[in-house]
Structure formats: C-alpha cells, structure tokens
Regions:
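Phosphate/nucleotide-binding beta-alpha loop and adjacent structural elements of enzyme active sites
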Residues: 1-255
Length: 255
C-alpha cells in the first residue's frame, strides 16, 4: 500500500519523505547556516545575555527571533531609516526595558549620507553623496552615533552579544565600539565574498576576519549564507566571532 501511495503522489510531482526531528540542541548533528539554531546552541553552552545590541535592526525581525531565545535579555536597537521607526517603537513598547536609536553607527559622531534601496534592506552608507540621487529621494543625511559614547555616558550597559548587519559599514561601526572588545562575548557580523560594484568599498571577508583577530576574536560559527541573484554564487555570509580565550572555546578537544 505504501508503495502505491508514494507512486500516486510522485505522479503528481510530490515526493513523500519522513520528517526528521531537529537534532538535539548543542549536538554535532545541528545544521550550519541557521541563525536561530546558533543562538539556541550559544545559550545551551552557557551564554547569558543581559543586553543584546542589534545594529541595523531594520524591522526588528532578528531581534524578535533572538528575544524568543533569550527572553530575559534587554535590547538596544540601532537603525537609521525613518521608515522603521514604528517597528522600533512597537518593539520597545512590547519589551519596556529595551531602547532604540534612530541613527546609524560609526567610528565617530557625525552626519553621513545613506543611500536607500527600494527594499529598505540593502540601504548603505558606503556610496558617495550624489545630488541626483538625493533629489530623487534615494539618498538622505542621517545622524551617526558612536557606540563607545552610549556606553561611557551610561545610556546602555555593556552588550553581551552584538549583531551588525549594515551593508559593508561593519568595520566602521566596530571602530566606534572599542570599549566592547574584551567584554562583549559574541559578535555576529555580515561579511562579503565579493567587492560589489553597486556598493563600492565593501570590506572583504578577509578584512573582517583579520580585524577581529587583531582584537582577539575568532570565528566560531556561520549562522547564515546568501547567494547573489546574478549567478547564484555564494556572496555573503554571517560569521559568529567569539573571544579567542573565552568560555565558549575553553575546550579544544574533538570529543
């Protein structure tokens, strides 16, 4: 009977497979490339978060997912696009001890030009100012804050985990967050495998890895991958960095 049922559904273009349960949290069977699974595993291995910082918070999707995994953590959201203000306000109203800043982040406090993409997800600070784009509403001036100043002024506590997804501006954000190195346990950074023509100046994946290694942070996991539409080549990946001598790397055993 099973054979005939499978044949019937195959003839309709469907394939029947047995659903495999998700491997146990923290096991070596967990798939690579899934952000939520990495966060669950970090928590399982002992990561405790009082404050999580989301730089490039966009519509708060990542923060909402992370809040489900670390329900007692407070959040600091940094996002420069006015279109996201309502989402940021809703998040902070729903989770009252969280805070948001409607600004970008960089090496110093400043005013810079943000180039807006149609999907509002790929907006970047890297392209140079262009009068034509500004007149078309595709560029605008935004305020830039420095994360070190947020910490030293007491506006936020030291984050335990920082995620940065800012379309090639990650290293500039980190240059303004020097106080976090050595204290923040985990960084999750978007990196690129190409120097894209449409966003000039994107740091290479090697640049990001070396920058973090110089500050005693090493690769721990890869929670996300993205192929480019042009030809399907792997173009971006999220890298989880942890302290080189931190508790997450306490053991160097294989088994």
């Amino acid at each position: 009977m099973k054979y005939f049922i499978k044949k019937f559904f195959n003839s309709l273009g469907f394939e029947i497979k047995r659903l495999n349960p998700q491997p146990q949290i923290g096991s070596d069977k967990r798939p690579v490339g899934q952000m939520d699974l990495l966060l669950e595993d970090l928590k399982f291995r002992g990561l405790k978060c009082q404050l999580i910082m989301d730089v490039g918070a966009n519509r708060t999707y990542w923060s909402r997912m992370t809040k489900r995994i670390f329900p007692t953590a407070n959040f600091c959201l940094i996002e420069p696009q006015i279109e996201m203000q309502n989402d940021l306000e809703i998040f902070c109203k729903e989770f009252p001890n969280s805070i948001f800043f409607l600004a970008g982040a960089g090496e110093k406090e400043d005013t810079l030009t943000l180039t807006i993409w149609d999907d509002l997800a790929g907006s970047s600070l890297l392209p140079l100012p262009n009068n034509k784009l500004e007149n078309e509403g595709k560029q605008r001036k935004i305020n830039i804050l420095k994360i070190d100043n947020l910490i030293s002024s007491g506006k936020i506590k030291m984050p335990n985990l920082i995620k940065i997804d800012v379309q090639g501006f990650e290293l500039e954000v980190l240059k303004g967050a020097t106080k976090t190195f050595g204290d923040t346990e985990v960084f999750i950074l978007e990196t690129s495998l190409f120097s894209f023509d449409d966003i000039p100046g994107v740091p290479s994946i090697a640049d990001v890895i070396n920058f973090m290694l110089e500050r005693n942070y090493v690769i721990y996991d890869f929670p996300g991958f993205l192929r480019r539409p042009l030809d399907g080549a792997l173009a971006q990946c999220d890298i989880c960095f942890v302290k080189q001598n931190g508790f997450l790397r306490r053991s160097h055993k294989w088994k």
